[in-house]
């Protein structure tokens, strides 16, 4: 083998995907092994790591069959820790030059992997995300896009809007992020601690028959974690919002005083009371909730709560 040849590891978190996993892995390996662009870049698929994140549908049995292929290895977590914890568990078992992460349900097209590798190798980027094209009627995906844009704007991190679970990252960058990450960390925010050299490759998310394992509550928790992982900037945003709301309440009160003194429009006394209560009550509740969420993250980290624990590794 060419000693200068670089290696790639693909980490796939697995959760309740008994019907999709085998096809996804087979397509991945066949696509990469038949790619002339991949070979021209002098890269080799060295390892596919399947991380079972507490599946209860028989996915572990499929994994047991797949690991008969020497390229495929597996990690089984003790319970369901979440996608990011599963990915970090896989990343920490790698030593490859580039690490790819993708979903197990077949929505991610492996055909763009050589292009992702090319951007790292030739264009000197360190983090590459798949940029999905969505239909304007896809409310779930569009809400995800706008949520990331909103969080990116208040955290002043322009790269947050690019994040997706289909990514290619230089191995040294990903492993460094995995070492520093903890329960309060959001994977892509952690990557941003290490590198800002981010780019994208455009693709289309494929339609599969699998139902999403994310409930509405799970999606809210997912973006809540991203929001709080953005550091102290949301606190600064809330502080500025408090000033804006206070100014708005002051203007509303001045309007009421003007109408009371200079016009014949009757103003009920309870109107001003409600304005004050709503504005300042809302600010206090938001502030208390925000601070409480930060404190809970600090407590979880300081108490030594594990990010993940491994049951076995093959």
Stretch-by-stretch model annotation:
Residues 37-54, 76:
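Short beta-strand/loop segment that forms part of the nucleotide-sugar
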Residues 7-9, 47:
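Cell-envelope/extracellular polymer assembly enzymes that use nucleotide-activated donors
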Residues 17-38:
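Short, well-formed alpha-helical segments that are part of the catalytic scaffolds
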Residues 2-5, 19, 189-314:
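Hydrophobic helical membrane-anchoring modules
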């Amino acid at each position: 083998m060419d000693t200068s040849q670089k290696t790639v590891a693909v980490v796939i978190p697995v959760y309740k995907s008994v019907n999709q996993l085998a096809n996804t892995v087979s397509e991945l390996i066949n696509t990469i092994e038949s790619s002339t662009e991949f070979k021209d870049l002098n890269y080799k698929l060295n390892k596919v790591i399947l991380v079972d994140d507490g599946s209860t549908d028989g996915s572990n049995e499929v994994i047991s069959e797949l690991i008969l292929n020497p390229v495929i290895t597996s990690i089984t977590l003790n319970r369901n820790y979440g996608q990011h914890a599963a990915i970090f568990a896989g990343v920490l078992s790698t030593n490859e030059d580039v690490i790819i992460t993708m979903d197990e349900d077949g929505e991610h097209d492996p055909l763009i992997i050589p292009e992702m590798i090319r951007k790292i190798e030739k264009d000197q980027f360190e983090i590459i995300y798949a940029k999905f094209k969505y239909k304007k009627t896809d409310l779930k995906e569009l809400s995800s896009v706008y949520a990331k844009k909103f969080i990116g704007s208040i955290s002043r991190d322009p790269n947050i809007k690019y994040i997706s679970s289909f990514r290619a990252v230089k191995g040294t960058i990903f492993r460094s992020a995995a070492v520093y990450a903890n329960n309060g960390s959001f994977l892509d925010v952690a990557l941003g601690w290490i590198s800002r050299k981010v780019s994208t490759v455009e693709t289309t998310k494929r339609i599969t028959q699998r139902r999403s394992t994310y409930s509405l509550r799970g999606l809210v928790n997912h973006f809540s974690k991203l929001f709080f992982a953005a550091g102290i900037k949301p606190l600064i945003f809330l502080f500025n919002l408090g000033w804006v709301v206070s100014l708005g309440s002051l203007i509303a009160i001045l309007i009421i005083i003007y109408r009371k003194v200079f016009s014949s429009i009757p103003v009920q006394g309870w109107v001003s009371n409600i304005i004050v209560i709503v504005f300042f009550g809302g600010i206090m509740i938001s502030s208390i909730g925000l601070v409480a969420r930060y404190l809970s993250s600090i407590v979880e980290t300081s108490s030594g709560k594990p990010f993940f624990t491994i049951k076995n590794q093959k």
